Amino acid sequence: MSAVRSAPAIPLPRAPGVRRVETGWHRTVRRFRKNPLSVLGALIVVAFALIALLAPVLAHPTERNPYMIPHSGYSSDPRPPGPGHPFGTTEEQFDLYYGVVWGARTAFLVALMVVATAVITALILGSVSGYYGGPADELVMRITDIFLAFPGLILAVVIVAVLGQSVRNAVIAIAVVEWPTYTRLLRGEFLRVRDIEYVQAAQALGGGDFHIITRHVIPNTIYPMLILASLNMGGIVITFAALSFLGLGAPPGYADWGQLINLSHNWIAGTAGDPFTYWYTLIVPGTAIFLFVLGWNLLGDAFRDIFDPHLQGSR
């Protein structure tokens, strides 16, 4: 029996005036590429991500703890950039280059842990508050009001002062500061979505609350959380750097940009005759913080422009 051969498919010419259907992914990429600042932000974030991933290659780690900056003496005077120390050294001769490279990994780890903790907390409390309402909503909102009444940095300082100086305790403190904002945002999105027709249809068909929340509500409320998280990454790193500079975040000698500034805080103003003598002790870690925050802010603005339905109609 002979096999039936199929004729090769011949592509049909596109009719005049008919546009190709654009998928969601292509639409997202197109909107992203239309904004040069979005591309710049993505490039900056990717560059820092590569530095963090390649930290063991770019700066050979110390044997006992890769996050502890090696130092080549105990001289109190910082040394300018030169052979062996391309970015210079801080007080007690901690290598700025090593601290900047491994500090990129610290920045990502701290920011991601804080965001993950805040998002998980918001998914639990915001879902209960926004979906069920009533006493649960009232209780959660009053708790968030209490936390939001305190200035964020001061609250973080108090928490770390009580728990003790460490990276873990600083992460806990910043997460405590951040979770109310995420919770209120998600609760507002739940209030908006829970009365839409497809949610009411799922309830009418006998769907359980957990099924409706996880399958119908959360997927349609998560984008504002992603936008907030991307915009918040830089702020988290600034807060952690501030805690380290105050001696409440990373321990002395830890690879963190705020800790690098703290190690040379006595020399930031330079000498009496030349205030820029030790410029590198502030400019090098300060530039790393500035670029990291700038990259995430530009990327967060891009996500907002792409995913915010109120902005899509005007573009």
Q: Positions of the model-derived regions?
A:
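Alpha-helical transmembrane segments of integral membrane proteins
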Residues: E91-R315
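Residue-level signal for helical boundary/lining positions with a hydrophobic bias
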Residues: R31, L58, P86-T89, V162, ...
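Short, intrinsically disordered, low-complexity terminal/loop segments
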Residues: M1-V4, G313-R315
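N-terminal signal-anchor/first transmembrane alpha helix
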Residues: S2-V4, P13-N65, V140-I143, T221-I222
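Intrinsically disordered, low-complexity segments enriched in proline/serine/threonine
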Residues: I10-P13, L58, E63, M68, ...
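Short, membrane-interfacial amphipathic segments enriched in basic
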Residues: I10-T28, G82-D95, Y132, F210-R215, ...
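Hydrophobic alpha-helical transmembrane segments of membrane transport/permease proteins
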Residues: S2-R5, I51-T89, S244-A255
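Intrinsically disordered, low-complexity segments enriched in polar/charged residues with Gly/Pro
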Residues: P16-V18, R64-P66, H71-S76, L185, ...
